[in-house]
Regions:
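Short, conserved micro-motifs composed of acidic
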Residues: 1-247, 251-260, 272-278
Length: 280
């Protein structure tokens, strides 16, 4: 934030207007100094919360909208990548509504839908999560419904390749402030919603979760910061390795060579193995 282009304070955060930055890891695995994103994306206004098309050539971003004698609101813009540069953002028209806020874009992994947050009419109160088709658009605007949205605020959606939806909410039962939730659709078409609990969630605001490889990723939180500033955290759920050994014997305590062994997990998994010649 301190290195952002704008000189004014954000009407949303109260700090200096935000720009978009990127950072890479060096050969030792340490994060390098953040650099402003290349091109003409950053301006005097607030830029934040981005998502990319599956091919990485289109960026969807949240951008502040300022009008005289009105509260600061946000809109969704797009930028396209040509070579190493991002183009100047262009407003992405979702509806003709010029009064409501539109932000927190999240492109589905297949590139079919754009999920976003809005307080437009037709919701369930506060800010709701909506989606619209990126390929058809006309007539595809859809509120995610009462199972996801509450009279409170639902924000920062993120879609994984398996269809699971992650979002932050202060309307679902949580630990305090904004909590991160996981929503999985069952075979009947209903969302099953799960609070991510500690250590992902805290009594502060926890939001903006994204995933990288397997069960690792990043999220933001203002926990433990007396100034209320947001910090980026990383997380990883390590895989669990279980070593099982034994010997297959018959009623006479003799080893059974080439015996078929079934390992059944409580998640329904069923693995077939064969014993050695000595029954082990």
């Amino acid at each position: 934030t301190e290195k952002a282009l704008g000189k004014n304070k954000s009407g949303i955060t109260g700090t200096k207007n935000c720009d978009l930055f990127f950072s890479k890891k060096n050969e030792r695995g340490a994060w390098q100094k953040p650099e402003p994103i290349e091109g003409d994306v950053n301006t005097e206004d607030d830029e934040g919360v981005i998502s990319f098309s599956p091919d990485g050539t289109t960026m969807y971003l949240t951008k502040a909208r300022r009008e005289p004698n009105a509260d600061t609101s946000v809109e969704i813009y797009t930028s396209t990548r040509t070579g190493a540069q991002w183009s100047a953002p262009q407003k992405y028209e979702i509806t003709a509504d010029t009064l409501s806020a539109f932000g927190h874009p999240a492109v589905s992994p297949d590139g079919e839908f754009l999920y976003f947050v809005s307080d437009m009419p037709g919701g369930y109160g506060g800010k709701d999560i909506w989606r619209i088709s990126l390929t058809e658009k006309e007539g595809t605007l859809e509120n995610l419904g009462v199972q996801i949205n509450t009279p409170g605020d639902e924000m920062f959606p993120y879609i994984r390749s398996n269809g699971d939806l992650y979002f932050s909410s202060d309307g679902h039962p949580g630990m305090g402030g904004l909590d991160i939730f996981k929503a999985k659709m069952n075979d009947s078409g209903f969302w099953q919603i799960e609070n991510m609990k500690a250590p992902i969630n805290s009594q502060a605001d926890d939001f903006g979760i994204t995933f990288g490889e397997e069960e690792s990723g990043f999220f933001s939180s203002n926990r433990g910061d007396g100034r209320g500033y947001d910090n980026i955290y990383s997380f990883e759920l390590p895989s669990i390795s279980v070593w099982i050994s034994g010997t297959v014997i018959d009623k006479d305590d003799e080893p059974v060579p080439d015996a078929i062994i079934r390992i059944v997990g409580n998640d329904g998994s069923n693995q077939k193995e064969f014993a050695r010649k000595d029954g082990s």
